[in-house]
Every structure is written in C-alpha cells, then in structure tokens.
Amino acid sequence: MKSCPKCGQQAQDDVQICTQCGHKFDSRQALYRKSTDEDIQTNNIKMRKMVPWAIGFFILILIIILFFLLRNFNSPEAQTKILVNAIENNDKQKVATLLSTKDNKVDSEEAKVYINYIKDEVGLKQFVSDLKNTVHKLNKSKTSVASYIQTRSGQNILRVSKNGTRYIFFDNMSFTAPTKQPIVKPKEKTKYEFKSGGKKKTVIAEANKVTPIGNFIPGTYRIPAMKSTENGDFAGYLKFDFRQSNSETVDVTEDFEEANITVTLKGDTKLNDSSKKVTINDREMAFSSSKTYGPYPQNKDITISASGKAKDKTFTTQTKTIKASDLKYNTEITLNFDSEDIEDYVEKKEKEENSLKNKLIEFFAGYSLANNAAFNQSDFDFVSSYIKKGSSFYDDVKKRVSKGSLMMISSPQIIDAEKHGDKITATVRLINENGKQVDKEYELEQGSQDRLQLIKTSEK
C-alpha cells in the first residue's frame, strides 16, 4: 500500500493514477520502495540467523567474566590476599574470622595480639613473601597438603593447608594458627576469671597443681583477669609469651595487686618451735621464718598476730593492723612476745617439773624393785602399794604375778613428765628382762599426802 501525496488516499502499489484526485504516481518511487522492502526482508532473515550466535557469544563472555570474578575471590592467591590485607590493615575482626575453627574460636583481641606478634617476630614483608611462596608451592604440588610459616626463631606461627576445592577449579586454602596451653600453678586453690574466645571464662586451679587455662594462638599476652582465693579477690593480669616456650605449654606469670607478708618474731626463744602460729585475718597458720604468707589483696587492711606455747601455756603477741596504703608486693612485719612473762613462767614450771621428776625418780626406783620382788617371790603384795586398787592396771599386774608372766625392769629414767591436777603422765625409759631399752608411758594419780600410785601404762 501507498498514499497519494496530493490527497492522502490509500492505493495499491501497482496503481498508476489516484482514484480520488487523478494524481499520477511516479513508477520509479514504487520500484524503489519494492526494492527496499525486499532488502529489509532479507536483512531480517539474516538477523534471525545471527541472534543465536550473538546470545551464545554473550553467554560465553558472561562465563569468562564470572570465572575471573570467582578467581579474584576464590583462587589460592585471592585467599592469600584476603589474609594479607587483613593483617596489613590490622583488621582484627577479619583475622579472627579467618583463623577460627570449630574447635577453637579466636576473638578479636586474640587476633590483635597475633597480628602484632607476626609483625614483631616475622616482619610483615617477610611474612607476606613466605605466605605467597608457601601457597604457590602447595597449589602446584600434587603430594604436599600442608606447610608451616615460622618466626625468625623457628617457631610455627601459621599452618597453610589444602582443604578440598572451591567451585571445582580452585584449591581451597585453609589458614590455621597453632595453639599452646598457658598453665598456672598457684600456691593455694584459686579461681581465675577472664575473657577468652569472646566469652567469659572461669578456671579453678587446685593448690600446687599445674592447670591449663585454655588454648591460645601465638602471641605475647596480657589478659585482664580476676582471681579469688581464700585470702580475697584480686584484680590484675595473666601474662604469657610464646617466645618463652618450646613445648606445647607456656608458663603464666600472674600480675595482680597483691601483698605477700614476711613475719619476724621476737621474744620467742622459750617457745616450742612446733607450737608457733601466725594468725592473719582470722586464719591461723604454722609459723616459719622462711615462709612468705599470702598473697593478700592490696586494697584491704590486714590484721596479724602470733602465738606459741611454753610448758603447755599459750602466749600471744598483740594484734597489729597493716593499712592498705602500707601494703607492698613484699611486706615485712615484726611481732613481739613478752619475753619476760614467758621466761618467768618457764622458770616457775621448770622448778615444779624438777620437783616432780625427783618424786618420780624416787617412786620408780622403788617400783622397779617391788616389781622384781613380786616376780621373784610370786607375791603381788610386794608391788600392790604402788598401784591404785580398782584400776585395770592393778588387776592386770596381779594376774601377771599369779601366772608368772610379770616382766622384770631396771634402771628407770624419767624422760618427760607433766602434771594436770591430780593426774601425772610420765615417759620412763627402762631396761627390760631381755636387756633391751624401752620407753613406756605411765599415768599416775597423786593422792593425799602426795602419795603416788600407778593407774595405767602403755608402750610408746
């Protein structure tokens, strides 16, 4: 169809004259239009044939682009670059994510320590070079699956391993920091509280027992912590350095605000050494001049006193208070006994003991002779006056005499003697009928007119 240029009437392409106005159409224009339409139709056919090829080419381009995008983010080199960038930029959160495993979660603070440790102990430039070379060798190798990057001192700091593939084409590289166990060994049962793996952690360590506090990646650590003992609560730090360990563990140094007490006693020469005690904050402990007591919190006053026995009597010092402001890591204090009071009492008791010993020497000299006479004559009456009637010892000796089983004794020596009211205990060294020296403990009763009688006896 075509339009009349004069009146606009529609007409067939082969019509020569317009039926509306009689205008005569140009035959050359019709021929041109026909040729143009044929060209368009030919071009359309060609275009339809090219579309599938264009789509295929476009898809191929997309695949190539996608491959390079995947390669940029998933190839071993790309994985290496992610870790390197995180360390270079001190991105502790990214490093923590990359190093965390199912069994050991690394928090951002631990990652921060790790980053600094790499820069100090390897050097960033050297670390990047070692990491790239290691990844390249593993990627090319058909047999090796893992390798370590080390510090200048030869300690392992990063494990690089092949762990399957990504998107079929790329080796999946795994970066894992080796761990060690920091260990504590407190002098008394201690509870430690600190943050690890992004969570609050509590560790209870028994006295003088090696106890691990967790698993940590390489670094030089100073972890804020609280510890609690029978002596109180302490604020401070747990410190440990991987450079100081060549094993699977690393010793922890405790840095807390604590005071240790050294005690010196004066005026205690007459006291029994084994009886000496120190009482700190109402807790009594055995005294030793070489012992350090504590630790105790530096933010609280400390009360301290000492006690000891002489001749069965307990003597104490005055209680002293050490102000918190005077407490230091090593704090020394001197406690004074009233030496004159102790010496007067000891002198008095020694006189009494000497008098008692003299009585006992006389008593046991007579008793040994009477005992032997009773044995020789088979007559209990010789010894009966030395033993309290009605006591189990009285009946036992009487039975032995009648059976002829009473043992002869000689040369009695008084080793020790104590009097409590009307009761006396004495340790006596004798020679028995076999000629052997034996120590026996006797209990006596002092009756009217200071008369002594045996109640019981036993071997020491």
Swiss-Prot record:
Subcellular location as annotated: Cell membrane
Membrane-topology annotation of the record: Single-pass membrane protein
GO molecular function, one term: zinc ion binding
A Pfam family annotated for this UniProt entry: TcaA_5th
CC annotations in GO: plasma membrane
TM annotation in the entry: 50-70
Regions of this protein lying in the Extracellular compartment: 71-460
InterPro entries given in the database record: Mem_prot_TcaA, TcaA_2nd, TcaA_4th
Biological processes annotated in GO: response to antibiotic
Zinc finger (C4-type): 4-21
Main location: membrane
Key words of the record: Antibiotic resistance, Cell membrane, Membrane, Metal-binding, Transmembrane, Transmembrane helix, Zinc, Zinc-finger
Record topological domains on the Cytoplasmic side: 1-49
Protein purpose: Plays a major role in decreasing resistance to glycopeptide antibiotics.
Family (UniProt): Belongs to the TcaA family.
Protein name per UniProt: Membrane-associated protein TcaA
Organism of this sequence: Staphylococcus aureus (strain MSSA476)
Gene designation: tcaA
